[in-house]
């Protein structure tokens, strides 16, 4: 049980660190975080839309983040910041930006379709956006925006679909924003390619095969006649 408890504690600590970092770099466009333990310490890589806001003037903000991570029990944290190369294919970043737009007063339906159009125009194979909560009244509900192909079950839903989630704090309450994206470079299990076939080339190969068979049969017949003589 001690081993299982240790793994649970490590996962819980990573989750707490991720949620704290998400709140700290919210204005920079949070796109995810990788936490990797190495022999020299713990490598923490932040993926954001605007790295300059995370680094700060003279690197002061990133130094403050590094010191704060030590309070979570992370040994010798080494923080690096990477810019998200293709924001439209990063589901976590899209969820964060959509949540910030809702907090600024965007109407939920306008925001949902705007981000759906942006993601699909970038070349995504499919996108699904869900906004849940008290959208227009005291009664909570869920509004869904879908385009293209989205997989919900099986291994493809886990390995091929980018997922992101964030919250928007409104006067009526908290809205949950969920984004699922299938990038354009993903090959789905039901996709296949029909290659062009050169019919003349196949006919030529077929003729050569028949000719070879005829030569072999002729040679066998001559050998049989020679043996009979």
UniProtKB/Swiss-Prot annotation:
Region (Disordered): 202-229
GO biological process: translation
GO molecular function: rRNA binding; structural constituent of ribosome
Compositional bias (Low complexity): 219-229
Stored Gene3D superfamilies: 3.30.300.20, Ribosomal protein S3, C-terminal domain
Domain KH type-2, first and last residues per copy: 17-85
Family annotation (CDD domains): KH-II_30S_S3_arch (cd02411)
Xref: InterPro entries: KH_dom, KH_dom-like_a/b, KH_dom_type_2, KH_sf_prok-type, Ribosomal_S3_C_sf, Ribosomal_uS3_arc, Ribosomal_uS3_C, Ribosomal_uS3_euk/arc
Any single GO CC term annotated in Swiss-Prot or TrEMBL for this entry: cytosolic small ribosomal subunit
Keywords associated with the record: Ribonucleoprotein, Ribosomal protein, RNA-binding, rRNA-binding
Quaternary structure and interacting proteins, as annotated: Part of the 30S ribosomal subunit.
Free-text function comment from the UniProt entry: Binds the lower part of the 30S subunit head.
Family label: Belongs to the universal ribosomal protein uS3 family.
HAMAP family in the cross-refs: Ribosomal_uS3_A
Protein's UniProt name: Small ribosomal subunit protein uS3
Taxonomic lineage of the native organism: Archaea, Methanobacteriati, Methanobacteriota, Archaeoglobi, Archaeoglobales
